């Protein structure tokens, strides 16, 4: 019972494990079931047959065998023929064994190949009802090999509905390949449900077709739902892998380590991804130049790496590789293409520059500068005109004085040795230089360990030159005491012949002497005092007076030197107070500090002694001096002085007793600071001497002169204005605008044509108006007689727009005023002949027209009668017009417009 109970209690777990095992076995058996492949009756070698699912059957399988040697299976389950196969009986079968060494499991898959079966389009006629197994109206797996050779139409499969047992069913399909692009590629027999393909299909264009199958009765009834039907196009290895570039270019440095990456190539395949058809393998077919092979390519990634560290650009600077890519994981029957790859070896500085010669000999003349004396050549195997090839030269030894310089010729890479500082034959006849050379780019570690820097020795011979005198040292000095007597001789400048080291035959000449104090002896170069020497002069700096001397030899060669005359000081300058005016602000201070200076050397200067230099007892009583230090003293007042200016004489004496008196102007002010100093008015100025300076006097005189000029200008202006008043009487019609456009009849009075108003001016300036006789006024001219012979003439001619006034004063003065542009002579020449003609015509006609010799009254002017003029002198036939009125000045044109408006 216990055993039974035990078995019963464990039976549920045992049953669950048993069911799980059965499920796994069922799935495995379903994955390892028989596979039926539709193939042509003839298969060529290396032809793709189909694909079986190896991973689902036995995932850990590592050994695969086939029972038929005419076929082979790849890792992804693709089945290929190894030789030509003919299905003589229309079918062929073989078995694939799978074995896992880890789990010791074994599986097998049966593969059946079926050739094309000719299916009659005519539905078979049977008189009995066929019994068949029940079918489900469900999706049926269907596939088709791309690029199938047929024969077409190619039978794919048959679709049937379970309702065919009860109804007469018609089958139809729709979708891409039927009623959509590509049209009419598939069709189904209406009665049998057989599905056919009418032509070849390219998987790269159409990976699959999703069709919909329909089952209907003749009367249109649909007993089944539409059936989704997927037709998958099995891929065929019909596309070659293609490199992304036809020519690849890579660079790699020479002497690179093994395994250095050169570059990576890439190829693409249009076949179905993740299959053997697109599993690519890369390889190098050929290397040029020929082996040894220096490069390798990773078969899966296409990365090119180096296999040797002996890449030398100096031997071979470029390699060409022929590379290949092949699908089917590199199987011999896979498709492949090739491309070219150019690998350029990049230069590194692995070769040191070396001199072609180790010793050089050259020469240079002394005293020459900036000349090329030698070119040094080097050899470098690195890339020309690159930093690895260009040389840098250095003078290692022998150029301690900086006489030489070496530079690189950028074109030839030669070293150019130049002299930049003159050489002296008398000092050195030969110079030995050691020159080294390196590259611009740093050396690689391997190169720098091979050999040290390349060096060369250059021997430079200095040749002698007949040169001029040498002024060495260029600055020479002599010591002379100031104020020595004129004519005193002293040593001067000395130049030497560098070859003889003597001064014979050298002549001297003075080039500069700012104050003309000395003369230079032409033969010896000695100097003679020409004027008194003053150490305190402005041209003396730090007690030294410089002159420039030119030395010449017999051939005219020269040199220039400077002679510094050191002037020894004598006590010839007494101390003095430079600030001669001091301010004492009485409110804030009672003293002022005074400082004395001495132009002599300190040995002849301080300490100074300050004292009041005056016999005036008031100065001694009011002021007091107190010593502050060697050069300063304090001046303070003793009594309460008034605000003002005080002259205080002070004597300053140096240590040797030489003294001078300085009169100090002391300002005692009511101020806070010295800048605010102002003297109080009304206070006594003591005994200060206050004077006006020359500039103050000049300013006062200029002010007075300016005032007189202003007064004189005002008087002249007033006098001229009074003289110009009332030159003409107010009632003269010539100077007034009168109304002249009236045409009313005049009065019955007769006016005398000979009457003329005359203005007479007495000596006292009073003006009287009288009437002059006939002939006084002629042509609009008035004459005004004056008491003392003065005469005033007034011309007023309206016709030409011109007024002219002439005034002759009593005492010979003459004033003339022109108001307009026309001159008097032009108007006179124009009007005088016409006035003469008019006067003559009037005189000749007086006897005949006496009644018209007065103003006439015209009451009526007939229709169309020309407007005439009054008076006997009128002439209707006058030829001269009044066109000049059209060219009046602007002011008269305005007057005419005003009159016209009235």
Swiss-Prot record:
Pfam families listed in its UniProt record: CADH_Y-type_LIR (PF01049), Cadherin (PF00028), Cadherin_pro (PF08758)
UniProt keyword Calcium, yes or no: yes
CDD domains to which the protein is assigned, alphabetical: Cadherin_repeat
SMART domains: CA (SM00112), Cadherin_pro (SM01055)
Record: glycosylation sites: 166, 392, 546, 629
Tissue specificity comment: Expressed in intestinal epithelial cells (at protein level). Expressed in the heart. Expressed in tongue, bladder, stomach, liver, kidney, and lung.
Residues annotated as domain Cadherin: 136-243, 244-355, 356-471, 472-579, 580-694
Chain residues in the propeptide: 28-135
Subunit structure: Interacts with DSP, PKP2 and JUP. Interacts with DSG3; the interaction may limit the interaction of DSC3 with p38MAPK family members and therefore repress p38MAPK signaling activation.
Protein name, entry field: Desmocollin-2
Organism this protein belongs to: Mus musculus
